Amino acid sequence: MSIMKQRLPLGEFSSSKINKLAIANIADASEPRNHGENNVGTVCLPSIKSLMVSPEVYENTKSLPVPLMRSSGGGMACASKSSCQDGISTKTTSRDYSELSKKLQIRLQFAYYKYKTKQTDKNFTDLKSKHSITRPSKVATHSKSEPLTRRRKLVLSQGHYKTPARSKIKTPSSICSHDNTSSFTSFRGVSESSSTTADMNVADTTTPIRNNINTKHSNSHNRTLYQRQETPTSIKAAKSLIHLFTSNQ
């Protein structure tokens, strides 16, 4: 007989357990049977929730499905008992069911989640995009009106980029101010020492060289520069200072 005629109903689904499927009358009718030999093999499948909580590996189970072979009449017939046992032993030793049980557990968990949340018509990608955590984009510090200025990169002969180092040269204004202060202090100290040695009174008056100097900048803005120089009023004091600087003392 064919398998379609021997198909059995699924039975009742109770306490979240899969019904027991009975493989009956599959063997060929022409095959002789001994007295007391039962051809009905009952296969007990675990429940879905037990697979979700802790996946069991079917390595130590003895009730495995009976392997079927195609007979000459078009139906399915069971092989001999020795060949069936050999096939079962080789399958259990060669195949590892841990990876398959893990995949089945994940698929069952996902199907159970879709059933509970009533989202059976959606795919995994839709649910993933819905529950994915979106990180906020980095806000630019500069405004849109101001252009973003970036430092230029210098290209070497080998084609690599080199960022230009920051200039450590001081501006002329800072150099002039620093030199003026240092020269003024040194000049004043030397003038005081020379005045004590030469017994000459050097006045501390300030004689302006140029009161107002109007120069035009590149931006056409007039700037007024005030320059002042401290010079002694006595010619003898100036000569003594020149002699002091030129001497080896």
From Swiss-Prot:
Compartment list: Cytoplasm; Nucleus
- Gene Ontology molecular function: any one: DNA-binding transcription factor binding
Q: Name one Pfam family in it.
A: Whi5
Residue numbers of Phosphoserine PTMs = S145
Q: Where are the transmembrane segments?
A: none
Q: Where is this region: Disordered?
A: 208-230
The remark listed among the other comments is: Present with 2880 molecules/cell in log phase SD medium.
> What protein family does this chain belong to?
Belongs to the WHI5/NRM1 family.
Protein name (Swiss-Prot/TrEMBL): Transcription factor NRM1
Species of the source:
Saccharomyces cerevisiae (strain ATCC 204508 / S288c)
Q: What is the lineage of its organism?
A: Eukaryota, Fungi, Dikarya, Ascomycota, Saccharomycotina
